[in-house]
Amino acid sequence: MKELGRLITAMVTPFKKDGTVDYAQAQKLALGLLDSGSDGLVVVGTTGESPTVTWEEEHALFAAVKSAVGNRGKVIAGTGANSTQEALENTLKAEKIGVDACLLVVPYYNKPTQEGLYLHFKTIAEATKLPCILYNVPSRTITHMSPETVIRLSQIPNIVGVKEASGKLDDIAQIINNVRPDFTVWSGNDSDTLPMLAMGAYGVISVASHIVGKQIKEMITSFVSGNTDNAAAIHRHLTPLIRSLFVVSNPIPIKYALNYLGFEVGGLRLPMTEADEKTAALIRESLKGYTIDLPIK
């Protein structure tokens, strides 16, 4: 679904010092991300600490961000769960709130079969009018959604795309070759964005775009317009920063980076912990080589 945008940021969830959600800061961050190149935002995905944000907090975040953003950009609600019924109910609530689409992660922990994955996503998609984006991230879910399952699901009209974070480029090529023409493939890994664009993917659902969104957007637009040399140069330039943002589990590094740069997003909820000094020093050193696109003040 091309109108959701080529550059979508998987947004962190800001917390106050007491650990509660900072809805006002989430709104400020959302607007800053749109100002720095993002076409849309994923709210309460992996980067938004979805496992430790309650359903009530999720719904309030969907509403707060959508209220702030309005028609300036797309709001994609992270409504997935490893219970089909819970994911369905969460998606229907997000639809009532008025978000633009939903992101549905492969069910984690319970290790469904490929048929189970197909029925899980089919059940949710057929119950909502929202555009649904599949999210394949086997490094977190253990279960890998096969290309055949994605291709099969792409025949359901409101399953409009997939965030592919498996890193399996051969599988991704198979998907791109066999889905319907308007089915959209986004990279789910910042480091895979340019390679996947070269294979026919549309864009990226990004973490690094919190701080270098304009540069990632330029890389994408350069590639699309045929200036592949510039796109490749930007990709190479951003690689060390991207590496530092994933040196430990996301969103630990990006939250540290934002706080260090002066955009307060608070801490993390257990069992996630804040960056230790070794990690923090690595991130600080990496940031020295980059222009920061996010408006900080």
Curated annotation (Swiss-Prot):
Enzyme Commission no: 4.3.3.7
GO function term, MF aspect, one: 4-hydroxy-tetrahydrodipicolinate synthase activity
Positions with a binding annotation for pyruvate: T47, I205
Catalytic reaction equation(s): L-aspartate 4-semialdehyde + pyruvate = (2S,4S)-4-hydroxy-2,3,4,5-tetrahydrodipicolinate + H2O + H(+)
Class of the enzyme per the UniProt entry, highest EC level: lyase
InterPro entries, sorted: Aldolase_TIM (IPR013785), DapA (IPR005263), DapA-like (IPR002220), Schiff_base-form_aldolases_AS (IPR020625), Schiff_base-form_aldolases_CS (IPR020624)
Disulfide bonds: none
Site (Part of a proton relay during catalysis) residue list: T46, Y109
Keywords, comma-separated and alphabetical: Amino-acid biosynthesis, Cytoplasm, Diaminopimelate biosynthesis, Lyase, Lysine biosynthesis, Schiff base
One annotated GO biological process: diaminopimelate biosynthetic process
Superkingdom of origin: Bacteria
Classification via PROSITE patterns: DHDPS_1, DHDPS_2
Residues at the catalytic site: Y135 (proton donor/acceptor), K163 (schiff-base intermediate with substrate)
SMART domains: DHDPS
Pathway this chain belongs to: Amino-acid biosynthesis; L-lysine biosynthesis via DAP pathway; (S)-tetrahydrodipicolinate from L-aspartate: step 3/4
Compartment(s) where it occurs, according to its Swiss-Prot or TrEMBL record: Cytoplasm
GO cellular component, one term: cytosol
NCBIfam families: dapA
Assembly behavior: Homotetramer; dimer of dimers.
Function: Catalyzes the condensation of (S)-aspartate-beta-semialdehyde [(S)-ASA] and pyruvate to 4-hydroxy-tetrahydrodipicolinate (HTPA).
Family: Belongs to the DapA family.
HAMAP family in the record: DapA
Protein name (Swiss-Prot/TrEMBL): 4-hydroxy-tetrahydrodipicolinate synthase
Origin species: Dehalococcoides mccartyi (strain ATCC BAA-2266 / KCTC 15142 / 195) (Dehalococcoides ethenogenes (strain 195))
